[in-house]
Amino acid sequence: SSKLKLNNLIAIIDYNKYQATGKSDEILNIKPLSKKWISFGWDAIECNGNDHNSISKKINFLLKKKSNKPKVLIAHTIKGKGVDFMENDNNWHYRSPNIDEVKKSKIQLDI
């Protein structure tokens, strides 16, 4: 992407620090993630991925940025944010909620 100067490309990473089988740092530490992307020729910025306003502001910033590089937004998120029994619980990577859990989730998410 950087070689081709795809300056209209924006990648968004949902960086919740978990992989399929556990915490990312325990499997393969890739910190600092933004420096990795920069070393690959991308412009990289970070935001609070649980805050829609933060995401929107950072995307608008990237859209206006004068650069020949592709861009990446690293959105720091909490896995399962907003549902107390799902937050930071990697079991939800594999399973679906039952009816009672769906009801409880909807109440907690106010939907």
PLM regions with names:
Residues 1-111:
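Glycine-rich ThDP/TPP pyrophosphate-binding loop and its adjacent helix/strand module
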